[in-house]
Amino acid sequence: MQPDRDTLLAGAQALGCPLSDTQADALLAYLGLLQRWNQVYNLTAIRDPKQMLVQHLLDSLAVIAPLNRVAGSAPLRLLDVGSGGGLPGVVIAVLRPDCQITCVDTVAKKATFIRQVTAELRLPQLVARHARVEQLTDGPYSVITARAFASLADLVKLTRPLLAPGGCWMAMKGQHPQAEIDALDADINVFHVEQLSVPGLDAERRLVWMRPRSVASS
């Protein structure tokens, strides 16, 4: 596991979120759980451990520095929509233990897996929900995020009732989603589209930040 640990530590450092030993241990334990469960429950199409580390852990770690910059260091409530195996929700929970994080997915086995992660990694602030996001009533959330979930317009439509006043959406995308941005309602302000560089990943990554225009910065 040492090469994986070195890759993780170096990647996190390059992403501006250096890991403590405890955080690195937790993320590698999570990766091990994901690999074991994936053999039976098909949580992710990626099966190679090294690819999992880059395409799941480092890809999710790439949002930590931007999240800290935009949302600040104060505790917040975050909703991870279509979380799958807990990405990026579990990774954020490890790096931001002060935050209350809810991972929601329509697939029961994925929610069950996240509950197992919560228990084994001792992350009491991480909650898994097996539900459609539009069925949730436990908002509001300061930040709503999604990775490979749906179009920006659908994300906003399904989750807007759950967004706290002054809150924002943080959508993880690949190439610059100009067509999706153009399809948003006029009252949604895309206040930043950030290009991410994930160590070891030869693919484009963008982080799209949105908020209702009524609270957009002038």
UniProtKB/Swiss-Prot annotation:
Record-listed S-adenosyl-L-methionine binding positions: 82, 87, 133-134, 147
EC number annotated for this UniProt entry: 2.1.1.170
Domain of life: Bacteria
Signal peptide: none
Annotated Pfam families: GidB
Keyword Transcription carried by entry: no
UniProt GO MF annotations: rRNA (guanine-N7-)-methyltransferase activity
Transmembrane domains' residue ranges: none
HAMAP family, A to Z: 16SrRNA_methyltr_G
Family: Belongs to the methyltransferase superfamily. RNA methyltransferase RsmG family.
Protein function: Specifically methylates the N7 position of guanine in position 527 of 16S rRNA.
This protein's name: Ribosomal RNA small subunit methyltransferase G
Gene (UniProt): rsmG
